Amino acid sequence: MKSVITTTISARDAAGRFPSRSDLESVQGNIQRSAARLEAAEKISAGHEGVVKEAGDACFAKYTYLKTSGEAGDSQDKVNKCYRDIDHYMRLINYSLVVGGTGPLDEWGIAGAREVYRALNLPASAYIAAFAYTRDRVCVPRDMSAQAAVEFIGALDYVNSLS
């Protein structure tokens, strides 16, 4: 699984070199932000059911046509799958916060997602709306500290930027 630390070590090892000063500063910054990332991961874990439900509800409220016949949410089974997908991405965001890098999202979430959504007639914009709602709903200090919110929002924005 990729993280800033494993990526730095792998790149330098492949080049047959020791990590540079800037490499070590990058790793140090990553380590210094770890407490905030872990706080965000803990808060997401504790309230993930509510976060997923609100994100899914926001998605279907914005894209009401999804529940019409022939669309991605035209049955309860399909609606449940949408919520399942949002939950899956929230877990990957959580894992990415824990490891301190985008590895879980890159390796398990993003690869092929666009093709799958296209083949199943699932609009990526609906998922983007769900994560944008989650991002905009984060409230400091109600939900988490300011630094934890920065880390969480960064992970949400990373997912949205790849869509």
Curated annotation (Swiss-Prot):
It comes from the Eukaryota. It is found in: Plastid, Chloroplast thylakoid membrane. The keyword Cell membrane does not apply. (2R,3E)-phycoerythrobilin 2 binds at C139. It is a peripheral membrane protein. GO terms for cellular component: chloroplast thylakoid membrane; phycobilisome. (2R,3E)-phycoerythrobilin 1 binds at C82. Keywords: Antenna complex, Bile pigment, Chloroplast, Chromophore, Electron transport, Membrane, Photosynthesis, Phycobilisome, Plastid, Thylakoid, Transport. The keyword Isomerase does not apply. SUPFAM superfamilies: Globin-like (SSF46458). Contains two covalently linked bilin chromophores. Signal peptide: none annotated. Pfam families: Phycobilisome. Coiled coil: none annotated. One of its GO terms (biological process) is photosynthesis. Heterodimer of an alpha and a beta chain. Light-harvesting photosynthetic bile pigment-protein from the phycobiliprotein complex. Belongs to the phycobiliprotein family. This is R-phycoerythrin alpha chain. The lineage of its organism: Eukaryota, Rhodophyta, Florideophyceae, Rhodymeniophycidae, Ceramiales.
